[in-house]
Amino acid sequence: MTRYLISFDDGAMTFPEEELPAVAEAAHAVTREAQDAGVWVFAGGLHPVDEVSVVATDGTVTDGPESKAYMGGLTILDVPSREEALEWAARFAVACRCAQEVREVMSDPAVGN
C-alpha cells in the first residue's frame, strides 16, 4: 500500500456560500466511503491564510504565507496504486466541486512509514 495526499487550493471552491452545507455533506460521504473501504488515513480542511505563521530556519516567526497558492484542505489515503488514488481524487473532485491534486507521499523506513 502507498499513501497519497489528495488536496485542493484554498481558492478552488467557487460555489455560492449557501451551497457549502451540501458540498460538505457530499465530501463527508466520500470520506465515509474511504473509511469503510479501509483506505482513509486522515482528512481535514485548513483555516484561512490570514491565520498562517511562517517559521524561518533561524526561528524567526512572521505572519502570512510566503506563496500565492494555498492549500485549502487535504486527505491522505493508503491505497494499492496510483490509479486507485486518482479514482478517489475524482470522487472528491465531484463532491467538493473543485479540482484535486494527487501526490504520492514519500515513505521513510527510518520513521516507520
Residue ranges and their predicted role:
Residues 1-113:
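Conserved, structured core segments of small domains
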